[in-house]
Amino acid sequence: MRCVPVFIILLLLSPSAPSVDAHPMTKDDVPQASFHDDAKRTLQVPWMKRGCCARLTCCVGR
C-alpha cells in the first residue's frame, strides 16, 4: 500500500506520449518556410532595395 502513492506521483510526473497529427496533409497544404529560408530572405531584401550585387562592384546607387 505504501507504493501506490509513489506510483501515482511518478505516473503524474512522466511525460505524456507525443500526439499524432489528426489531420493528414492534403495537396492544398503548403509547408511552412524553414528558419534557413527566412534568414536567406531577410538577408536578400536590403540588397534588392539598394540595387547592388553581392560583390559591391556593380552598385548603381539608385
From Swiss-Prot:
It comes from Conus quercinus (Oak cone). The lineage of its organism: Eukaryota, Metazoa, Spiralia, Lophotrochozoa, Mollusca. Expressed by the venom duct. This is Conotoxin Qc5.1. The keyword Cytoplasm does not apply. Residues 1-22 form the signal peptide. Belongs to the conotoxin T superfamily. Keywords: Amidation, Cleavage on pair of basic residues, Disulfide bond, Neurotoxin, Secreted, Signal, Toxin. GO terms for molecular function: toxin activity. The cysteine framework is V (CC-CC).
